[in-house]
UniProtKB/Swiss-Prot annotation:
InterPro entries: AB_hydrolase_fold, LYPA1-2/EST-like, PLipase/COase/thioEstase. One of its GO terms (biological process) is negative regulation of cGAS/STING signaling pathway. The modification N-acetylalanine is found at A2. This is Lysophospholipase-like protein 1. One of its GO terms (cellular component) is cytosol. The gene is LYPLAL1. Its EC number is 3.1.2.22. The active site is at S124, D179, H211. Keywords: Acetylation, Cytoplasm, Hydrolase. The keyword Iron-sulfur does not apply. GO terms for molecular function: carboxylic ester hydrolase activity; palmitoyl-(protein) hydrolase activity.
């Protein structure tokens, strides 16, 4: 697996309606797929998430053994020792996937999309993966979003940011206060740690929302995406 590249990733792609000038990489949660995430978003919004100028890439994590499932095989971006914020990260698996997803970013750059026109984000584990990818390896992307996600207390992301002195991508973070799988307090802690390390970020909290996507959340995410990746008309205003 050490030599894995983006070629191992199945991907679901939603093409822009007009000229492609920006790209969005949207990472699913544990046990899901790129196609599954796209269909879930479509169900919540009652329509596909689409843009005039932004290509959306929904990759699928390659199947691997997952410790919280007693070693069962699942589509996960990395392994966890357990689902909590106070245990060590499984850095070996995180770093392998950072390289695989870096290859995916490089593919977009080779096709003519600048790094500052690429956004990375995800739901749950996908959001955690996006934060590792952007803040440890790609601090020149347009922005990062994390929906119902968290970082472990001693995360390698925090260690990387302590050594950083450049401009960091903004983080858009959302979390349901009723989430019982990934606690809202873990998201608050992640947000305050990143803020203290120089990341511009706001945590949007949603009362009565569990570990799920909500329409309100996706509506404000879409607006934020357009502020980070404006089309030609928006840039001229």
């Amino acid at each position: 697996m050490a030599a894995a590249s983006a070629s191992v990733l199945q991907r679901c792609i939603v093409s822009p309606a007009g000229r492609h000038s920006a790209s969005l990489i949207f990472l699913h949660g544990s046990g899901d797929s790129g196609q599954g995430l796209r269909m879930w978003i479509k169900q919540v919004l009652n329509q596909d998430l689409t843009f005039q100028h932004i290509k959306i890439i929904y990759p699928t994590a390659p199947p691997r053994s997952y410790t919280p499932m007693k070693g069962g095989i699942s589509n996960v971006w990395f392994d966890r020792f357990k689902i909590t914020n106070d245990c060590p990260e499984h850095l070996e698996s995180i770093d392998v996937m950072c390289q695989v997803l870096t290859d995916l970013i490089d593919e977009e750059v080779k096709s003519g999309i600048k790094k500052n026109r690429i956004l990375i984000g995800g739901f749950s584990m996908g959001g955690s993966m996006a934060m590792h990818l952007a803040y440890r390896n790609h601090q020149d992307v347009a922005g990062v979003f994390a929906l119902s996600s968290f970082l472990n207390k001693a995360s390698a992301v925090y260690q990387a940011l302590q050594k950083s002195n450049g401009v960091l991508p903004e983080l858009f973070q959302c979390h349901g206060t009723a989430d019982e799988l990934v606690l809202h307090s873990w998201a608050e802690e992640t947000n305050s740690m990143l803020k203290s390390l120089g990341v511009t970020t706001k945590l949007h909290s949603f009362p009565d929302v569990y570990h799920e996507l909500s329409k309100t959340e996706l509506d404000i995410l879409k607006l934020w995406i357009l502020t980070k990746l404006p089309g030609e008309m928006e840039k001229q205003k």
